[in-house]
Design a protein with these regions (language model features):
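N-terminal leader/propeptide and maturation segments of large enzyme subunits in energy/redox metabolism
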Residues: 125-198
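Short, small/polar residue-rich loop motifs at catalytic or cofactor-binding pockets
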Residues: 14-17, 77-79
């Protein structure tokens, strides 16, 4: 709600095209809002794991911008702010806000074109670009100079940073009340419970080989198949 109340773009304050999640220090999704979008939330863990796999030390003074579809993004307009939270010098959680930017550069206004033949035509790609938590940096000037609705982009970006600060404040209140170890144990318990339920559901499926085929929308001219084969 903080983001919807402070953003400038109608796609945010009317369309609610954004999601906010909490990720643990290993890159596991542990919490999300009931209003979040699955197509934002599901890839977020890969956005964070990609940052961790780089091996670069996570800096408490930085956030990391990510939208690369090859490493956990969706389409380029959906930009994730990966906001690390440290306690007593230890990385404990990541707050991640993924939101649709009205324009991210590229060949057409809005950065969405059926005529694009390569990703470079779709706009700017961010693969964990470090930015100070203030949101003020030369790299942001470069980014804003290469999108079409600069005023909205700046306002939405700073609204997103502010929302992450609100989330951090609320998270720190929980950590102060219950302790880091207890909160981390609770998060691990949620993941373990989810695994038990999923394994229980899978165990009811008879052993065998299963196949399902579907097709991408809008490809009637060649009907490119997407096939999944599963053996139990």
């Amino acid at each position: 709600r903080s983001f919807a109340a402070s953003a400038y773009s109608s796609i945010i304050y009317e369309g609610y095209d954004f999601s906010c999640v909490l990720i643990d220090a290993t890159g596991q999704l542990v919490a999300q809002s009931g209003e979040d979008h699955p197509f934002h939330v599901i890839p977020v863990a890969w956005s964070v794991k990609g940052l961790l796999e780089k091996g670069t030390p996570i800096d408490d003074s930085l956030v990391y911008l990510h939208n690369d579809p090859y490493t956990g993004g969706t389409h380029l307009n959906d930009v994730a702010i990966v906001y690390p939270v440290f306690e007593a010098g230890e990385l404990v959680f990541f707050i991640v806000l993924r939101a649709h930017w009205a324009d991210i550069g590229g060949m057409t206004p809005g950065s969405l074109s059926g005529a694009a033949r390569e990703i470079l035509q779709e706009g700017l790609r961010f693969n964990h670009v470090p930015v100070p938590k203030s949101g003020i940096a030369p790299v942001m000037d470069l980014i804003f100079d290469n999108v079409r609705v600069t005023r909205e982009a700046k306002a939405d970006f700073h609204a997103a940073i502010g929302t992450c600060r609100v989330a951090e404040r609320r998270l720190r209140a929980v950590l102060a009340k219950y302790g880091v170890a207890t909160v981390q144990a609770a998060a691990a318990g949620v993941l373990a419970a989810a695994e038990r339920r999923m394994r229980g559901a899978i165990s009811t499926v008879p052993d065998g080989c299963y196949r399902f085929t579907s097709y991408l929308d809008g490809r009637d001219h060649d009907r490119f198949p997407l096939q999944v084969d599963v053996a139990l």
